[in-house]
A protein has these predicted regions:
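Single-stranded RNA-binding regions, centering on S1/OB-family and related RNA-binding modules
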Residues: 1-91
């Protein structure tokens, strides 16, 4: 599934999907999507709506099941995800 730009040039978010946190990096965490098995990155900026909650101490634990949405694919081919509640709640 690809994510396409809307009329304003911003990416349209994919549907809400469940994933499992499988890995941490300094810049974010990796989730494996339950249905597709795709692996994607939730970078720190996309991890939470509140700036003070975007730190590793506030990220979900390894093995936690989380809701995410696809943001698109980075130039290097990496799937980008968002875990921000404001993005999850969008229709």
């Amino acid at each position: 599934m690809s994510v396409q730009d809307n009329n304003e040039g911003r990416p349209e978010l994919g549907p809400v999907e469940w994933g499992k946190v499988v890995e941490y990096h300094l810049w974010g965490y990796v989730a494996k999507l339950n249905d597709s098995g795709d692996i994607g990155l939730v970078d720190a900026v996309s991890s939470h709506d509140l700036l003070e909650r975007r730190i590793p101490d506030c990220w979900p634990a390894l093995g936690d099941h989380i809701k995410v949405r696809r943001l698109g694919v980075a130039p290097g081919g990496q799937l980008r995800l968002t875990g921000r509640q404001s993005d999850i709640d969008l229709n």
